[in-house]
Amino acid sequence: MKASRFFIGTLKEAPADAEIVSHKLMVRAGMIRRVAGGIYNYLPVGLRSIRKVEAIVREEMNRAGAIELLMPAVQPAELWQESGRWEQYGPELLRFKDRKQNEFVIGPTHEEVVTDIARNQIKSYRQMPVNFYQIQTKFRDEIRPRFGVMRGREFIMKDAYSFDKDHESLKESYKKMYDAYVRIFTRIGFEFRPVAADNGSIGGSGSHEFHVIADTGEDAIAYCPTSDFAANVEAAEALPLLASRAAPAEAMQKVATPGKAKCEAVAELMGIPLERTIKSIVLATDNEGAEPTIWLLMLRGDHDLNEIKTAKLPGLAGHRFATEAEIVEWFGTPPGYLGPIGTKKPVRVVADRTVANMSDFVVGANEVDYHIAGVNWGRDLPEPVVADIRNVKAGDPSPDGKGALDICRGIEVGHVFQLGTKYSDAMGATFIDESGKAQPMVMGCYGIGITRILGAAIEQNFDDKGIVWPEAIAPFEVVLCPMGYDRSDAVREAADKLYADLAAAGIDVILDDRGERPGVMFADWELIGVPHRLVIGERGLKDGKIEYQGRRDAEATLLPADSAAAAVAEKVRAALAR
């Protein structure tokens, strides 16, 4: 590629709405341009990187035995109504009507369409396992698109769907996809972690997210530095921090706490550790034709509620936070002084595992400006329902028993799910098994955010000059910067030969023949992030040398002109082989 025949749309300044590094640099490097909120044009530099990501994904999916197809972006509403997600999905699902008033959606995902394919095409267990995948544009009408390609409304995604005869076979399909994802993200050059995750609106029984480690990540990841354990904080099991309950050592007493509605303020006033206070959270579940059921969830004062875990407890699916009026009706006091002792109306109490092993703790007195200290289970309160309802914290014991947890931030770039029969049951996708009986197909689904990978890679690889691409997805692997290409025959001949030699070696090389000043050339390619640069100048050629500098190198080095192409080609190959 010659730069004079390519489009280079670099900018000196980032747009005012760009909040994170990847968004700023993708615009400045001429990769993307905004069309509307969360919708972007991908300019030639950006598209080259997208195509390289797609190529890696496609190679590894094919290697894992998946079969590529292409499904429509526009999907009929009937399929979503069959699955039940027409009502469940909410405003993120972009719905519209055609001229005949038929309802359609722009697909954010393709479980319904692929299940329709399977139920019409797969009839026997002999046709399974099968795994279909596609690389296609999706649309989710995010309420607040931000961070460039990180949370866009339109995006490119690889989605795959496996169909198996039973759950044991699904586990094998799932493992193949898990391993393929590890290979994909390793080849791209990410520092990443697969983490146990919640299935969310997709449904199913088991899932893993693949997170690129980055300080700007939206997700909190709990991991053990001394083992392989990693999980999304939403899904990580929180073990009790007390092995057993100590015997009571204090009498229960009512304590004045004027104006102290927060656990931190109560602990400071009483001169006790925050860990001895209880945080009371009130939830409600609605009952048709009757008053709601009110729940009091008890957490240690320094812990936070995990709503995803809570929603999985018996009776708490579809819960909501109680209104202030409901709190006053059931507890006799507004929030800030709530507790399980002396409620006006019966409430259901759930204690976190750590709270269940606490002694002599402090709770609200259900009276403004008062708390109760020295409270103990069994003596002052009946034994509670005990459940894991909190988020883990750094320093908590790892669930695998192999050390303590730490917390980092992650950007989700892939997700694999064991769906089971959720969609096949709803949509009648059955096959005939070995005994001649109809059985529901057992499904898995596996997604990778192609365009999000670009943003995640930049969040992990940048400096004050611009992007520092991993070789595998850089728009170009090598840039040639000739000094005076349009003025010096020697420079032009040397640059053209280097270009031809590198291209013949299979290297993705661009020759900057624009005639720009050295400072402009260097700034453009450092901003764009090309991993390897060769500078050809008359002075160096007289000594038989060409200047080489890797994008991560602090200083340039000199290479023999006659072997520079081979040396740089070997550097590229070595980087790609890592």
Curated annotation (Swiss-Prot):
This is Proline--tRNA ligase. It is found in: Cytoplasm. One of its GO terms (biological process) is prolyl-tRNA aminoacylation. Its EC number is 6.1.1.15. It catalyses: tRNA(Pro) + L-proline + ATP = L-prolyl-tRNA(Pro) + AMP + diphosphate. GO terms for cellular component: cytosol. InterPro entries: aa-tRNA-synt_IIb, aa-tRNA-synth_II, aa-tRNA-synth_II/BPL/LPL, Anticodon-bd, Anticodon-bd_dom_sf, Pro-tRNA-ligase_IIa, Pro-tRNA-synth_IIa_bac-type, Pro-tRNA-Synthase_IIa_type1. The gene is proS. The keyword rRNA processing does not apply. Homodimer. CDD domains: ProRS-INS (cd04334), ProRS_anticodon_short (cd00861), ProRS_core_prok (cd00779). Belongs to the class-II aminoacyl-tRNA synthetase family. ProS type 1 subfamily. Catalyzes the attachment of proline to tRNA(Pro) in a two-step reaction: proline is first activated by ATP to form Pro-AMP and then transferred to the acceptor end of tRNA(Pro). As ProRS can inadvertently accommodate and process non-cognate amino acids such as alanine and cysteine, to avoid such errors it has two additional distinct editing activities against alanine. One activity is designated as 'pretransfer' editing and involves the tRNA(Pro)-independent hydrolysis of activated Ala-AMP. Coiled coil: none annotated. The keyword Cytoplasm applies. PROSITE patterns: AA_TRNA_LIGASE_II. GO terms for molecular function: aminoacyl-tRNA deacylase activity; ATP binding; proline-tRNA ligase activity. Keywords: Aminoacyl-tRNA synthetase, ATP-binding, Cytoplasm, Ligase, Nucleotide-binding, Protein biosynthesis. Consists of three domains: the N-terminal catalytic domain, the editing domain and the C-terminal anticodon-binding domain. It comes from the Bacteria.
